[in-house]
Amino acid sequence: MREEMIEKKYEEMGISKEVYRFGKKIEDELKERFAAIDATAEYNQMKVIDAMQKNRVSAECFAMSNGYGYNDLGRDTLEKVYASCFHGEDALVRPQITCGTHALALALMSNLRPGDELLSPVGKPYDTLEEVIGIRPSKGSLAEYGITYRQVDLLSDGSFDYENIKKAINEKTYLVTIQRSKGYQTRPTLSVERIGELISFIKSIKPDVICMVDNCYGEFVEEREPLDVGADMIVGSLIKNPGGGLAPIGGYIVGKKECVENAAYRLTSPGLGKEVGASLNVISSFYQGLFQAPVVTAGALKGAIFAANIYERLGFAVVPNGTESRHDIIQAVTLNSPEGLIAFCKGIQAAAPVDSYVTPEPWAMPGYDSDVIMAAGAFVQGSSIELSADGPLREPYAVYFQGGLTWYHAKLGILMSLQKLYEQKLVNEDMMC
Protein backbone atom coordinates (compact mmCIF):
# COMPACT_ATOMS: atom_id res chain seq x y z
CA MET A 1 0.00 0.00 0.00
CA ARG A 2 2.75 2.47 0.95
CA GLU A 3 4.73 1.75 -2.23
CA GLU A 4 1.60 2.29 -4.30
CA MET A 5 1.02 5.65 -2.57
CA ILE A 6 4.59 6.74 -3.33
CA GLU A 7 4.36 5.67 -6.97
CA LYS A 8 1.06 7.51 -7.34
CA LYS A 9 2.57 10.68 -5.86
CA TYR A 10 5.45 10.56 -8.34
CA GLU A 11 2.92 10.07 -11.13
CA GLU A 12 1.01 13.16 -9.94
CA MET A 13 4.30 15.08 -10.20
CA GLY A 14 4.83 14.04 -13.81
CA ILE A 15 6.89 10.85 -13.52
CA SER A 16 5.47 8.06 -15.70
CA LYS A 17 5.15 4.52 -14.39
CA GLU A 18 7.81 3.35 -16.83
CA VAL A 19 10.38 5.84 -15.56
CA TYR A 20 9.47 5.38 -11.88
CA ARG A 21 9.67 1.57 -11.99
CA PHE A 22 12.96 1.66 -13.84
CA GLY A 23 14.33 3.98 -11.17
CA LYS A 24 12.96 1.79 -8.37
CA LYS A 25 14.74 -1.23 -9.82
CA ILE A 26 18.05 0.66 -9.89
CA GLU A 27 17.52 1.99 -6.35
CA ASP A 28 16.89 -1.51 -4.98
CA GLU A 29 20.21 -2.66 -6.45
CA LEU A 30 22.08 0.11 -4.59
CA LYS A 31 21.06 -0.65 -0.99
CA GLU A 32 24.48 -1.99 0.04
CA ARG A 33 26.26 0.95 -1.59
CA PHE A 34 24.00 3.43 0.16
CA ALA A 35 24.66 1.75 3.52
CA ALA A 36 28.40 2.35 3.04
CA ILE A 37 27.73 6.04 2.32
CA ASP A 38 25.71 6.28 5.53
CA ALA A 39 28.65 4.81 7.47
CA THR A 40 31.00 7.49 6.10
CA ALA A 41 28.44 10.16 6.98
CA GLU A 42 28.22 8.85 10.53
CA TYR A 43 32.01 9.03 10.96
CA ASN A 44 32.14 12.56 9.55
CA GLN A 45 29.20 13.65 11.68
CA MET A 46 31.12 12.58 14.79
CA LYS A 47 34.18 14.44 13.47
CA VAL A 48 32.21 17.69 13.18
CA ILE A 49 30.58 17.33 16.60
CA ASP A 50 33.96 16.55 18.16
CA ALA A 51 35.46 19.73 16.62
CA MET A 52 32.56 21.82 17.93
CA GLN A 53 32.81 20.36 21.43
CA LYS A 54 36.58 20.74 21.67
CA ASN A 55 36.33 24.40 20.69
CA ARG A 56 33.52 25.08 23.18
CA VAL A 57 30.86 26.30 20.78
CA SER A 58 28.21 28.14 22.81
CA ALA A 59 24.98 30.03 22.17
CA GLU A 60 27.00 33.27 22.37
CA CYS A 61 28.75 32.23 19.15
CA PHE A 62 25.53 32.82 17.20
CA ALA A 63 25.26 36.52 18.05
CA MET A 64 25.35 38.97 15.16
CA SER A 65 28.34 41.29 14.82
CA ASN A 66 28.68 44.40 12.68
CA GLY A 67 31.07 47.22 11.92
CA TYR A 68 34.71 46.24 12.21
CA GLY A 69 33.90 42.92 13.81
CA TYR A 70 36.55 43.20 16.51
CA ASN A 71 36.47 40.33 19.04
CA ASP A 72 33.79 38.46 17.10
CA LEU A 73 33.51 35.30 19.22
CA GLY A 74 31.35 33.41 16.73
CA ARG A 75 33.65 34.09 13.79
CA ASP A 76 36.84 33.28 15.68
CA THR A 77 35.42 30.09 17.20
CA LEU A 78 34.07 28.91 13.85
CA GLU A 79 37.54 29.25 12.34
CA LYS A 80 38.94 27.12 15.15
CA VAL A 81 36.22 24.54 14.48
CA TYR A 82 37.14 24.41 10.77
CA ALA A 83 40.84 24.07 11.60
CA SER A 84 40.07 21.20 14.00
CA CYS A 85 37.64 19.46 11.67
CA PHE A 86 39.91 19.55 8.61
CA HIS A 87 43.15 19.15 10.60
CA GLY A 88 44.77 22.46 9.74
CA GLU A 89 46.83 24.87 11.83
CA ASP A 90 44.51 27.79 11.09
CA ALA A 91 41.42 28.70 9.08
CA LEU A 92 39.78 31.65 7.37
CA VAL A 93 35.99 31.21 7.08
CA ARG A 94 34.20 34.37 6.01
CA PRO A 95 31.02 35.65 4.39
CA GLN A 96 33.24 38.24 2.68
CA ILE A 97 34.62 35.40 0.51
CA THR A 98 31.92 35.41 -2.14
CA CYS A 99 32.38 32.08 -3.93
CA GLY A 100 34.78 29.20 -4.58
CA THR A 101 36.61 31.05 -7.36
CA HIS A 102 37.08 34.03 -5.03
CA ALA A 103 38.49 31.74 -2.32
CA LEU A 104 40.92 30.17 -4.78
CA ALA A 105 41.98 33.54 -6.20
CA LEU A 106 42.51 34.80 -2.66
CA ALA A 107 44.67 31.81 -1.72
CA LEU A 108 46.76 32.10 -4.89
CA MET A 109 47.23 35.85 -4.95
CA SER A 110 48.12 36.05 -1.27
CA ASN A 111 50.74 33.32 -1.38
CA LEU A 112 52.41 34.03 -4.74
CA ARG A 113 54.70 36.94 -5.60
CA PRO A 114 56.00 38.37 -8.90
CA GLY A 115 58.59 36.00 -10.35
CA ASP A 116 56.99 32.91 -8.79
CA GLU A 117 55.54 30.13 -10.88
CA LEU A 118 52.28 28.27 -10.34
CA LEU A 119 52.14 24.62 -11.40
CA SER A 120 49.06 22.52 -12.11
CA PRO A 121 50.10 18.85 -12.33
CA VAL A 122 46.53 17.67 -12.99
CA GLY A 123 45.82 19.47 -16.24
CA LYS A 124 43.52 22.33 -17.11
CA PRO A 125 41.88 24.14 -14.20
CA TYR A 126 38.19 24.97 -13.87
CA ASP A 127 37.03 27.50 -16.49
CA THR A 128 36.66 30.45 -14.09
CA LEU A 129 40.26 30.03 -12.88
CA GLU A 130 41.62 30.55 -16.39
CA GLU A 131 41.04 34.29 -16.01
CA VAL A 132 42.40 34.32 -12.46
CA ILE A 133 45.63 32.73 -13.67
CA GLY A 134 45.77 34.64 -16.94
CA ILE A 135 45.41 31.73 -19.34
CA ARG A 136 42.66 33.89 -20.79
CA PRO A 137 43.65 37.56 -20.44
CA SER A 138 41.85 39.37 -17.64
CA LYS A 139 42.39 42.46 -15.50
CA GLY A 140 44.14 41.67 -12.23
CA SER A 141 45.22 38.15 -13.20
CA LEU A 142 48.33 36.44 -11.84
CA ALA A 143 49.95 36.90 -15.24
CA GLU A 144 49.52 40.69 -14.96
CA TYR A 145 51.56 40.55 -11.75
CA GLY A 146 54.41 38.62 -13.35
CA ILE A 147 53.44 35.22 -11.94
CA THR A 148 53.91 32.51 -14.54
CA TYR A 149 51.92 29.32 -14.99
CA ARG A 150 52.89 25.83 -16.05
CA GLN A 151 50.59 22.88 -16.62
CA VAL A 152 51.15 19.13 -16.92
CA ASP A 153 48.19 17.19 -18.27
CA LEU A 154 47.12 13.83 -16.95
CA LEU A 155 47.95 10.81 -19.07
CA SER A 156 45.24 9.32 -21.28
CA ASP A 157 44.31 6.79 -18.59
CA GLY A 158 43.84 9.53 -15.99
CA SER A 159 47.09 8.83 -14.14
CA PHE A 160 49.70 11.43 -13.20
CA ASP A 161 52.47 12.15 -15.70
CA TYR A 162 55.23 11.90 -13.10
CA GLU A 163 58.04 12.23 -15.64
CA ASN A 164 56.83 15.57 -16.97
CA ILE A 165 55.80 16.80 -13.51
CA LYS A 166 59.39 16.30 -12.39
CA LYS A 167 60.65 18.22 -15.44
CA ALA A 168 58.17 21.04 -14.80
CA ILE A 169 59.31 21.69 -11.22
CA ASN A 170 62.07 24.31 -11.19
CA GLU A 171 63.57 27.01 -8.97
CA LYS A 172 60.59 29.32 -9.67
CA THR A 173 57.92 26.76 -8.72
CA TYR A 174 56.45 28.16 -5.53
CA LEU A 175 52.91 26.81 -5.37
CA VAL A 176 51.27 23.70 -6.80
CA THR A 177 47.51 23.73 -7.30
CA ILE A 178 45.65 20.42 -7.34
CA GLN A 179 42.01 20.45 -8.39
CA ARG A 180 40.30 17.55 -6.65
CA SER A 181 37.11 17.56 -8.71
CA LYS A 182 36.84 17.14 -12.45
CA GLY A 183 35.26 20.51 -13.27
CA TYR A 184 33.92 20.63 -16.84
CA GLN A 185 36.07 17.68 -17.84
CA THR A 186 35.57 13.95 -18.06
CA ARG A 187 38.75 13.05 -16.21
CA PRO A 188 38.47 11.13 -12.93
CA THR A 189 38.03 13.05 -9.70
CA LEU A 190 41.06 12.57 -7.46
CA SER A 191 40.78 10.51 -4.29
CA VAL A 192 42.42 11.77 -1.12
CA GLU A 193 44.81 8.83 -1.39
CA ARG A 194 45.90 9.79 -4.92
CA ILE A 195 46.28 13.42 -3.88
CA GLY A 196 48.57 12.27 -1.07
CA GLU A 197 50.69 10.22 -3.48
CA LEU A 198 51.06 13.22 -5.80
CA ILE A 199 51.99 15.58 -2.96
CA SER A 200 54.58 13.11 -1.64
CA PHE A 201 56.17 12.91 -5.08
CA ILE A 202 56.24 16.69 -5.53
CA LYS A 203 57.68 17.34 -2.07
CA SER A 204 60.36 14.69 -2.63
CA ILE A 205 61.60 16.94 -5.44
CA LYS A 206 60.99 20.32 -3.78
CA PRO A 207 60.10 20.02 -0.07
CA ASP A 208 59.30 23.70 0.50
CA VAL A 209 56.75 24.04 -2.31
CA ILE A 210 53.21 24.94 -1.18
CA CYS A 211 50.65 22.31 -2.20
CA MET A 212 47.14 23.75 -2.39
CA VAL A 213 44.06 21.60 -3.03
CA ASP A 214 40.87 22.97 -4.54
CA ASN A 215 38.57 20.95 -2.28
CA CYS A 216 35.27 22.05 -3.85
CA TYR A 217 32.66 19.29 -4.02
CA GLY A 218 34.86 16.87 -2.07
CA GLU A 219 34.35 17.73 1.60
CA PHE A 220 32.94 14.87 3.72
CA VAL A 221 32.77 12.43 0.79
CA GLU A 222 35.60 10.41 2.36
CA GLU A 223 36.72 9.99 5.95
CA ARG A 224 39.98 11.83 5.24
CA GLU A 225 40.64 15.26 3.75
CA PRO A 226 43.68 16.50 1.76
CA LEU A 227 45.36 18.09 4.81
CA ASP A 228 45.56 14.56 6.27
CA VAL A 229 47.83 13.48 3.40
CA GLY A 230 50.29 16.36 3.19
CA ALA A 231 48.47 19.30 1.60
CA ASP A 232 49.48 22.71 2.95
CA MET A 233 46.21 24.43 2.19
CA ILE A 234 42.66 23.47 1.18
CA VAL A 235 40.16 25.89 -0.31
CA GLY A 236 36.42 25.70 -0.84
CA SER A 237 32.99 27.31 -0.89
CA LEU A 238 30.35 27.37 1.82
CA ILE A 239 27.55 27.11 -0.73
CA LYS A 240 28.88 23.68 -1.59
CA ASN A 241 29.33 20.72 0.78
CA PRO A 242 30.51 22.32 4.06
CA GLY A 243 27.66 24.84 4.19
CA GLY A 244 25.14 22.02 4.38
CA GLY A 245 22.66 23.96 2.26
CA LEU A 246 22.17 26.56 5.00
CA ALA A 247 25.13 28.91 4.51
CA PRO A 248 23.87 31.71 2.22
CA ILE A 249 27.36 32.83 1.15
CA GLY A 250 31.00 32.32 2.05
CA GLY A 251 34.23 30.48 1.46
CA TYR A 252 37.06 28.97 3.46
CA ILE A 253 40.81 28.46 3.47
CA VAL A 254 42.28 25.97 5.96
CA GLY A 255 45.89 24.90 6.34
CA LYS A 256 49.32 26.06 7.41
CA LYS A 257 49.19 29.14 9.61
CA GLU A 258 51.39 31.25 7.33
CA CYS A 259 49.30 30.44 4.25
CA VAL A 260 46.06 31.33 6.05
CA GLU A 261 47.52 34.54 7.50
CA ASN A 262 48.67 35.62 4.04
CA ALA A 263 45.13 35.08 2.75
CA ALA A 264 43.64 37.06 5.64
CA TYR A 265 45.91 40.05 4.95
CA ARG A 266 44.89 39.93 1.29
CA LEU A 267 41.17 39.66 2.13
CA THR A 268 41.24 42.66 4.49
CA SER A 269 44.49 44.64 4.56
CA PRO A 270 48.05 44.48 5.89
CA GLY A 271 48.01 45.05 9.62
CA LEU A 272 44.38 43.95 10.01
CA GLY A 273 44.22 40.36 8.76
CA LYS A 274 41.78 38.15 10.68
CA GLU A 275 41.00 40.78 13.32
CA VAL A 276 38.30 42.46 11.25
CA GLY A 277 35.38 41.26 9.18
CA ALA A 278 31.99 41.16 10.89
CA SER A 279 29.96 37.97 10.56
CA LEU A 280 26.71 39.97 10.38
CA ASN A 281 23.64 37.76 10.77
CA VAL A 282 24.86 34.66 8.92
CA ILE A 283 27.10 33.08 11.55
CA SER A 284 24.50 30.69 13.00
CA SER A 285 23.79 29.31 9.52
CA PHE A 286 27.54 28.66 9.09
CA TYR A 287 27.58 26.57 12.27
CA GLN A 288 24.33 24.76 11.59
CA GLY A 289 25.26 24.13 7.97
CA LEU A 290 28.59 22.59 8.95
CA PHE A 291 26.83 20.48 11.57
CA GLN A 292 24.52 18.86 9.04
CA ALA A 293 26.98 18.88 6.10
CA PRO A 294 28.03 15.20 6.41
CA VAL A 295 24.42 13.98 6.12
CA VAL A 296 23.53 16.43 3.34
CA THR A 297 26.66 15.39 1.43
CA ALA A 298 25.66 11.74 1.82
CA GLY A 299 22.27 12.45 0.22
CA ALA A 300 23.94 14.24 -2.69
CA LEU A 301 26.37 11.35 -3.09
CA LYS A 302 23.52 8.85 -3.27
CA GLY A 303 21.93 10.99 -5.97
CA ALA A 304 25.14 11.01 -8.01
CA ILE A 305 25.48 7.22 -7.80
CA PHE A 306 21.79 6.77 -8.66
CA ALA A 307 22.24 9.00 -11.73
CA ALA A 308 25.34 7.10 -12.84
CA ASN A 309 23.62 3.74 -12.64
CA ILE A 310 20.46 4.93 -14.41
CA TYR A 311 22.21 6.60 -17.32
CA GLU A 312 24.88 3.93 -17.67
CA ARG A 313 22.14 1.32 -17.92
CA LEU A 314 20.60 3.39 -20.72
CA GLY A 315 23.87 3.34 -22.67
CA PHE A 316 25.23 6.82 -21.94
CA ALA A 317 28.86 7.41 -20.98
CA VAL A 318 29.12 8.42 -17.32
CA VAL A 319 32.06 9.55 -15.17
CA PRO A 320 32.45 8.07 -12.62
CA ASN A 321 30.74 4.87 -13.69
CA GLY A 322 28.11 3.18 -11.58
CA THR A 323 30.51 1.01 -9.59
CA GLU A 324 33.55 3.27 -9.09
CA SER A 325 34.47 4.65 -5.68
CA ARG A 326 33.43 8.26 -5.14
CA HIS A 327 35.59 11.25 -4.26
CA ASP A 328 33.23 14.16 -4.94
CA ILE A 329 29.50 14.70 -5.42
CA ILE A 330 29.63 15.50 -9.14
CA GLN A 331 28.28 13.12 -11.75
CA ALA A 332 29.08 13.69 -15.41
CA VAL A 333 26.74 12.23 -18.03
CA THR A 334 27.61 12.57 -21.72
CA LEU A 335 24.30 13.13 -23.52
CA ASN A 336 25.80 13.39 -27.04
CA SER A 337 23.55 16.20 -28.28
CA PRO A 338 22.48 19.72 -27.31
CA GLU A 339 18.89 18.46 -27.19
CA GLY A 340 19.80 15.83 -24.60
CA LEU A 341 21.76 18.30 -22.47
CA ILE A 342 18.94 20.85 -22.50
CA ALA A 343 16.27 18.21 -21.76
CA PHE A 344 18.24 16.90 -18.78
CA CYS A 345 18.58 20.39 -17.30
CA LYS A 346 14.90 21.12 -17.87
CA GLY A 347 14.08 18.00 -15.86
CA ILE A 348 16.28 19.07 -12.95
CA GLN A 349 14.65 22.52 -12.95
CA ALA A 350 11.16 21.02 -13.05
CA ALA A 351 11.95 19.00 -9.91
CA ALA A 352 13.00 22.06 -7.89
CA PRO A 353 11.08 23.45 -4.90
CA VAL A 354 11.94 26.97 -6.10
CA ASP A 355 11.38 28.26 -9.66
CA SER A 356 10.16 24.88 -10.89
CA TYR A 357 8.05 26.70 -13.52
CA VAL A 358 11.13 28.33 -15.09
CA THR A 359 12.63 26.92 -18.29
CA PRO A 360 16.45 27.02 -18.31
CA GLU A 361 18.13 28.16 -21.52
CA PRO A 362 21.81 28.34 -22.56
CA TRP A 363 23.47 31.73 -22.03
CA ALA A 364 26.86 33.43 -22.13
CA MET A 365 27.79 33.08 -18.46
CA PRO A 366 30.66 35.28 -17.18
CA GLY A 367 33.92 33.36 -16.82
CA TYR A 368 33.16 30.70 -19.45
CA ASP A 369 34.25 30.54 -23.07
CA SER A 370 31.07 28.90 -24.40
CA ASP A 371 27.36 29.14 -23.66
CA VAL A 372 26.34 27.31 -20.49
CA ILE A 373 22.97 25.93 -19.42
CA MET A 374 22.25 25.77 -15.72
CA ALA A 375 19.35 24.29 -13.76
CA ALA A 376 19.12 25.28 -10.12
CA GLY A 377 15.86 25.92 -8.35
CA ALA A 378 17.72 26.64 -5.15
CA PHE A 379 17.10 28.48 -1.90
CA VAL A 380 20.62 29.97 -2.25
CA GLN A 381 21.58 31.31 -5.67
CA GLY A 382 24.41 29.27 -7.17
CA SER A 383 24.39 26.68 -4.40
CA SER A 384 25.68 23.40 -5.79
CA ILE A 385 25.02 21.33 -2.68
CA GLU A 386 21.39 21.94 -3.62
CA LEU A 387 20.03 19.97 -6.57
CA SER A 388 21.57 21.47 -9.69
CA ALA A 389 22.93 20.61 -13.10
CA ASP A 390 24.91 22.51 -15.64
CA GLY A 391 27.05 22.04 -18.67
CA PRO A 392 28.69 23.93 -21.54
CA LEU A 393 27.01 23.79 -24.94
CA ARG A 394 29.96 22.14 -26.62
CA GLU A 395 30.88 18.61 -27.59
CA PRO A 396 30.51 16.01 -26.13
CA TYR A 397 27.50 17.73 -24.48
CA ALA A 398 28.21 16.48 -21.01
CA VAL A 399 26.03 17.55 -18.11
CA TYR A 400 27.40 17.87 -14.60
CA PHE A 401 24.85 16.94 -11.95
CA GLN A 402 25.33 17.53 -8.26
CA GLY A 403 23.59 18.14 -4.99
CA GLY A 404 20.27 17.54 -3.35
CA LEU A 405 19.69 18.60 0.24
CA THR A 406 17.95 15.26 0.73
CA TRP A 407 18.34 11.96 -1.08
CA TYR A 408 14.65 12.02 -2.00
CA HIS A 409 14.96 15.34 -3.77
CA ALA A 410 18.03 14.13 -5.67
CA LYS A 411 16.06 11.03 -6.67
CA LEU A 412 13.15 13.12 -7.97
CA GLY A 413 15.51 15.29 -9.98
CA ILE A 414 17.12 12.33 -11.71
CA LEU A 415 13.78 10.72 -12.49
CA MET A 416 12.47 14.02 -13.86
CA SER A 417 15.56 14.43 -16.06
CA LEU A 418 14.95 10.95 -17.45
CA GLN A 419 11.26 11.77 -17.94
CA LYS A 420 12.17 14.75 -20.13
CA LEU A 421 14.49 12.63 -22.28
CA TYR A 422 11.77 9.96 -22.50
CA GLU A 423 9.17 12.50 -23.62
CA GLN A 424 11.52 13.76 -26.35
CA LYS A 425 12.18 10.18 -27.48
CA LEU A 426 15.87 10.48 -26.66
CA VAL A 427 15.41 7.29 -24.63
CA ASN A 428 12.70 4.68 -25.06
CA GLU A 429 10.92 2.03 -23.03
CA ASP A 430 13.00 -0.80 -24.47
CA MET A 431 16.15 0.86 -23.07
CA MET A 432 14.59 0.79 -19.58
CA CYS A 433 14.00 -2.96 -19.50
Model-derived segments and spans:
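Flexible linker/loop signature enriched in Pro/Ser/Thr and Pro/Gly
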Residues: 85-88
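Conserved PLP-enzyme active-site core in the AAT-like
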Residues: 2-27, 31, 38, 48-54, ...
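Short glycine-rich or small-residue beta-strand-to-loop segments that form or flank ligand, phosphate
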Residues: 61, 65-66, 92-95, 329-334
